[in-house]
Design a protein with these regions (language model features):
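Single conserved hydrophobic/aromatic residue that forms the stacking wall/gate
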Residues: 218-227
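Beta-propeller folds
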Residues: 1-219
Length: 227
C-alpha cells in the first residue's frame, strides 16, 4: 500500500562531525516512495529449471545482487542487498549479505555481512575494511579467494603492503590461508598451470600497474615483475 509510505515530514540528513568525502550522484533514492519502488524492482525469486523442462522454486524472494556457482557445481555463492537504503550513495554501497549454499539450496555458511557504506577515506584507491572481492578459484573445485586491506582502506596511510589475499576452503568459515600480499591495491589473479599464476595490482594516483609471476608451491609476495 503506497499510501502508507507517503512522507509525513521532511527528509533529514545528520552529520556527526566526521571527515568523509562523497561524490555527487544523479538519480539517488530521495524518499520512502523511492525506497519502495527500488525494493519492488530489485526483488526476484530464483527457480531451478531442469533439462527435462521442469521448474522448481529454488530460493525465496530477495534482492539478489550476484549468483556464482563453484567450478565443480556443488556450491553457489549468493549476495543479496539488505536494508537500510541510503539517500547519499548508490545501491552498490547498500548493505549486502553473502552466503554459501549447496547446489540443492541448503545453507552452508555466512561469508560476509557488509554494512551501509556512506563514508570512505579520500581518494580513488580507498576501499572498505574487512573481507572483500570473494571469487571462486577456477583451477579448483570449490575454493574461494578474498582480499583484506592492510592500510585500513585509506590510501594516505603509508604501509609496505596495501592488500593481502586469502584462500578459503570448505566449510567456508574463518580466516582462511594467506597466499599473497601486494604493494599496490590488488586487482586480480589469472590462475594458470598447476605451478604458475599471474597476479596484478594497481595504483590510480600514479597510473601504475604491475603483473607478477606467482608460484603455487611458494605463494608469498612475488619479486619478479613481468611488466
Amino acid at each position: 500500500d503506497t499510501n502508507k509510505i507517503v512522507p509525513d515530514g521532511p527528509t533529514i540528513s545528520t552529520n556527526f562531525g566526521e571527515k568523509a568525502q562523497n561524490r555527487t550522484y544523479q538519480d539517488l533514492l530521495k524518499n520512502k516512495f523511492d525506497e519502495h519502488n527500488f525494493e519492488q524492482l530489485s526483488t526476484s525469486t530464483i527457480y531451478k529449471v531442469s533439462i527435462d523442462g521442469s521448474v522448481k522454486k529454488w530460493m525465496d524472494d530477495g534482492m539478489y545482487r550476484t549468483i556464482s556457482f563453484s567450478p565443480n557445481g556443488e556450491y553457489v555463492m549468493i549476495s543479496q542487498i539488505k536494508k537500510p537504503f541510503s539517500y547519499l550513495v548508490t545501491y552498490s554501497r547498500f548493505p549486502t549479505e553473502t552466503n554459501i549454499y549447496t547446489k540443492d539450496g541448503d545453507f552452508v555458511s555466512n561469508l560476509l555481512n557488509v554494512p551501509l557504506i556512506e563514508e570512505l577515506p579520500k581518494g580513488f584507491m580507498s576501499v572498505r575494511t574487512g573481507k572483500r572481492s570473494f571469487n571462486w578459484r577456477p583451477d579448483k573445485g570449490a575454493s574461494l579467494t578474498y582480499v583484506i586491506a592492510l592500510d585500513s582502506g585509506d590510501p594516505s596511510n603509508k604501509v609496505d603492503f596495501r592488500d593481502e589475499v586469502y584462500e578459503l576452503n570448505y566449510p567456508f568459515s574463518g580466516q582462511g590461508k594467506s597466499i599473497l600480499k601486494t604493494i599496490n591495491r590488488f586487482s586480480g589473479i589469472d590462475w594458470g598451470t598447476k605451478n604458475m599464476a599471474i597476479a596484478y595490482d594497481t595504483w590510480w594516483n600514479t597510473r601504475n600497474r604491475k603483473s607478477y609471476a606467482v608460484s603455487y608451491t611458494h605463494l608469498t609476495l612475488p619479486t619478479k615483475a613481468l611488466v
